[in-house]
Amino acid sequence: MLENFVKVADMPQEVIEKYKDQVPAELVQIWQEDGLGTFLDGYLKVINPDDYLELLQDSYFRGDVAFPMFVTAFGDVITWEENAYVGIVQYNIQDLDIMIKRMDRFIEYVDDEDFKDDYFDIPLYKKAVARYGQLAYDECFGFVPLLALGAFKDVEHMDKLKTLEHIYLMYQLTGGVMDD
């Protein structure tokens, strides 16, 4: 279903069964046809929601109505929220954004240049890949030190980090993404 998808594993069948009635049909189709892996040249990863759900609920003020679907190369979590729209939780800058209503529209526009410019930092990602190499499935690029602690948003101040651990660290040091 996703173009240029690089599969790393099947989505566990028990996960599909557990969530199939709570998520959009398109996501279930991705899980069944594509599984776990990367797309958009490695920028986005299809994740096992069980790995991120508790973290999202604890670290995001809308975590009770958000479901983790994807994670970006910078540790942002793409969510399905209120059974209606796709959002992005940006732990690096303690912010969130509503990307688009309806999952089918997200899939349609995810590779659109304007959409990518609005929500993803593809140029910085390409520079990071050129300098540090491709990410492993469980890695993201993280800023060192964290942006909240004074790092500059450039490739000289980043490194490859384990995605889940990095998001937990950002949450612990910044308090997560809360409604101010």
Language model feature labels by segment:
Residues 87-124:
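Compact, glycine/acidic-enriched structural inserts
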Residues 7, 12, 24, 92-95, ...:
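Serine/threonine-rich low-complexity intrinsically disordered regions
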Residues 62, 102-105, 131:
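Arginine residue identity/basic-tract feature
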Residues 1-88, 141-180:
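A surface-exposed partner-binding patch
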